[in-house]
Amino acid sequence: MKQLTFALALLLLYISFPTSLPAAKVEVEGKAWLDAQKDPPEMNVNGVWDSEEWGDFHLTQADGSRDVSGNGGGYHIMGVVSGKRLFMLFFANHTVDYCATLSPNGENSLAGNYSNRKSRLHSGLCQESSRPMNMKKR
């Protein structure tokens, strides 16, 4: 009876802590987050940007397009411009690691926040708590 109780306790413990849940994928949760930003673009972020927090960003946005792609801070970048806001996902190996939202802050400057992705045990894409992020166009 003790062995059965011990085995059941281990099974419950194993089920309670699902460590193999997938992290947010850029093609699924990331795309859904970006698609939810629906305003037409009112700015273009194409070019090289410098961020104290992340280093250089090389962003590409075609004229009239909302879609943004590029790289920076050791990550691939996928994003959209919605109105006067830039929404970016930082990802590696198809997994979202950070989310950022930035708005114009003077000429050739963007300011906003970035946050870590949520842990594998929580639903959603990125955490509520965030840190400041600033970018200046070169």
Which stretches of residues belong to each language-model region?
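Central antiparallel beta-sheet cores of small beta-barrel/beta-sandwich binding domains
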Residues: 30-106, 111-118
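Amphipathic/hydrophobic helical signal segments and adjacent flexible N-terminal regions
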Residues: 2-48, 52-54, 113, 122-138
